[in-house]
């Protein structure tokens, strides 16, 4: 997780701008590619872990980024392979370069029913699929 939120904002803004140029739901076309399988989990981890550990939320104004996540969240492969939010937070909280969580919060996360943040806070207009 980056320590510099301004750098993160610039990177997310550039990604949103790039995604706005696509006419397909995924980076290489109408279905998931290897590239999407690299990018989507990283964005999802950022969304979940940064929210809990740093209080950072991806701005709703990044509508193309949210649309991209929306397509990922609705793809069966992504949904089946995505870890629960609690596992993502515990993974990142255990790293030396991220904020730690209290023992009480750690124990609570391990006992909770698994949650999956697949909701979209912005309007995610589906991309037009070209044949």
Regions found by a protein language model. Give the residues of each.
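Eukaryotic N-terminal low-complexity, Ser/Thr- and Lys/Arg-rich leader segments
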Residues: 93, 97-131
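C-terminal transmembrane module of eukaryotic multi-pass membrane proteins
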Residues: 64, 74-94, 101-106
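GST-like fold's C-terminal all-alpha helical module
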Residues: 1-83, 129-130
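Low-complexity, compositionally biased segments
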Residues: 7, 19, 39, 88, ...
């Amino acid at each position: 997780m980056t320590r510099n939120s301004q750098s993160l904002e610039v990177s997310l803004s550039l990604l949103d701008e790039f995604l706005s140029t696509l006419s397909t739901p995924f980076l290489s076309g109408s279905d998931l590619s290897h590239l999407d399988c690299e990018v989507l989990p990283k964005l999802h981890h950022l969304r979940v872990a940064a929210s809990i550990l740093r209080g950072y939320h991806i701005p709703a104004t990044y509508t193309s980024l949210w649309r991209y996540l929306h397509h990922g969240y609705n793809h069966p492969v992504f949904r089946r392979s995505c870890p629960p939010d609690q596992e993502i937070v515990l993974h990142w909280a255990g790293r030396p370069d991220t904020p730690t969580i209290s023992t009480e919060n750690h124990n609570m996360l391990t006992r909770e029913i698994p949650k999956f943040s697949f909701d979209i806070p912005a309007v995610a207009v589906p991309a037009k699929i070209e044949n």
